[in-house]
Amino acid sequence: MSHPIRVGVGGWSFEPWDETFYPPGLSKSKQLEYASRKLTAVEVNATYYSSFKPDTFAKWRDATPDGFMFSLKAHRFSTVRKTREDMKKSIDLFLGQGITALKEKLGPINWQFPPTRKFEKEYFEMFLSQLPKEKDKLPLRHALEVRNPTCDDPAFLELLSKHDATVVYAEDDDFPKIRHSGADFAVARLMQSKSDQPNGYSKADIDRFARTATDWAKKQDVFVFFISGAKERNPAAAMALQAKLGITPATAAEAGGMAAGKKAAAKPAAKKAPKASTKTPARTSSSPKKKK
């Protein structure tokens, strides 16, 4: 896929999506395969809490079509270290677990900092200097997600440019909305979907996102993720944005076979994505209220 804009959601396993996104009867083991044929990227939140073996990353890679990409959230401990030595140890541990098994499907790495981390030039200079530009000969793209308003500072953007990194644009009223045009890629996390909107957002909002992404894509590769908010609506939001942008993901023609856990027929009929339910599913234990 050569389109400069990729659109996705956070993860692929979320119980309410069984009603609003996945076809009836689709096995859990086939959810990534299905999602990757309806969307063009996904943000992996599980790497924020746990480490995985190279075989797991390779399995994810093999389950998805050409052009699909994974954005990984770096482990939460890697952005709370205070000394150069501890930073390097945590960063190396995360990058060394086997993420390069994703190969060309490895997208931006999101280094998410806590809201308490204020902008201090020396601190961020030290952190950014520990981020390698490649791993196992695979280029790495680093995006810092900051949640303290003091980071909305030109000096912060200068540091990012110096180290070929960018800042995550987080659309949420609780966090600063910082835009950086100095990198060759951009990452946006849209976090305000509403349960009373079948597509999570109004048509006007989807149109606005499309205009912004199109403008950014004139000079950058763009990754847009619908995260948190009314999470049950996020796949519908992502597909609505893709439709507005004219993005056509890999076909899900084999979805019928996936739904039954069987091999697809030689020439299966293409299935349409299930329509977003207008009924809000009950919140489950897998539907966290905390913003990620």
Identify what each model region corresponds to.
Residues M1-K292:
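Residues lining hydrophobic/aromatic ligand-binding pockets adjacent to catalytic sites
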